Amino acid sequence: MTDLAARLARPGPMTAVELRPPRRGLDTARSMDFWIDMYHAVQRFARQGTFVLLTDDAAGDAEEESLAHLAANLGDGSDFGTVVPFLTCKHPLEYCRMFARRAAALGTAGVAVVG
């Protein structure tokens, strides 16, 4: 049982946080600032044991691909066990499979598939 499944099975309230990557098309400086803030937030929440639900175009806005950025910039040794990336079914099947493989390789708590 994953940490997320175990936590969901326990009685009592649970706190989780949803974060969204920046919209595509931001200028470079604004996009970099956004990602730096997001990395710090994910690291802080991971240290606290708070699950982070990380959307990726889930709201229909064109957003940058979150999983690739996190893998590249959080660094080796980062705990992805509290990160739950969202995957929307609007992507081609091969992309969905690749996304799930990458999420598993990072050690994420799971993948939320939305439709």
Residue ranges of model-derived segments:
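Active-site beta->alpha loop and helix N-cap motifs at the rims of alpha/beta catalytic domains
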Residues: 2-115
